[in-house]
Amino acid sequence: LYFSIVSTFSVIASGRYEMAVVLPKTNEDSIRLVYLSVVFAFITAFVSLIVIILFGSEISDLLNNTRIQDWLILIPLSLFSVGVYQAFNFWLIRQKAFMASSFNKVAQRSFEGVSTIYYGLTNKGGGLIISDIIGRYSMLLIAIYQARKRGFFHVSFSWLEMKRLAKLYKSFPLNFGLSSLANSAGAHLPLLFISIAFHSLTVG
C-alpha cells in the first residue's frame, strides 16, 4: 500500500519540470530548472506532510489498514527523494553522464539490499519501507556529488530566473503532469480499491 501511494504521486513530485531539464540551450537554464524541480518537490512533500498530519487516521481507516498510519508520515520523505533525484538524473543525462546515472541505480539497490537484509535478520518492522528510503537517499546523495563534480553548483539560485523558466515550460506541469498522474493512478488505484474492499493481507 505504501509503495502504491508513493508511486502514484511521485510522478508529479517535481511538477514534471524535471523533464524539461534537457531542453534549454544554456546549461545555466538547465541547472535552474533542476532548482525549480527541487522547490516543487519540497512543496509536494510539505503538502503531503500536512495532509498526513491532519488526516492520517482517516486515510488509514479508508484503506482498511490501521497499521499503515505510522508509516504514512514517511511518504513525504519518499516523494521528496524521488522528485529531486529525477531532476538531477535528467541533468546528468544532459551532460551525457550515462555511466554515472547507471551507477546510481546500482548504488541504490546495494544500499537497499543491505538494509533489507539487516532488518530481516533483526526482525524489525517496516524494513522494506525504511530500506527503500535509505536506498533512494543514497542514490540521491551520490547524484548530487556527481553533479557537483561537473560544476553544477557554480550557477546561482535565482527566484527571478526560476519564475521565468516556470512560465516558459508551464506546459510540463499542466499537460504532462495531469496525464502522468492519471496514468499512474490507473496503474495503482486498483490495489488501493482492493485494500478498501477487503483487507491489507489480501493486497500484501
Each PLM stretch: what is its role?
Residues L1, S60-L62, Y118-T122, S184-G204:
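Helix-terminus/linker motif at the lipid-water interface of multi-pass membrane proteins
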Residues Q69-P76, S102-F152, T202-G204:
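Hydrophobic alpha-helical transmembrane segments
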Residues L1-K25, A41, L79-A87, M139-I142, ...:
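Small-residue-rich midsections of specific transmembrane alpha-helices
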Residues A20-D29, F80-A107, I117-Y118, T122:
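Membrane-interface junctions at transmembrane-helix termini in multi-pass inner-membrane proteins
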Residues L1-S10, Q69-D70, I130, R164-F172, ...:
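Interfacial/gating helices of multi-pass transporter permease domains
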Residues Y2, S7-S57, D70-I73:
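Membrane-water interface segments that mark the loop-to-transmembrane alpha-helix transition
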Residues F3, T8-F9, I50, L54, ...:
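Alpha-helical transmembrane segments of multi-pass membrane proteins
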Residues A143-H188:
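Interhelical loop/hinge segments that connect adjacent transmembrane helices in multipass membrane
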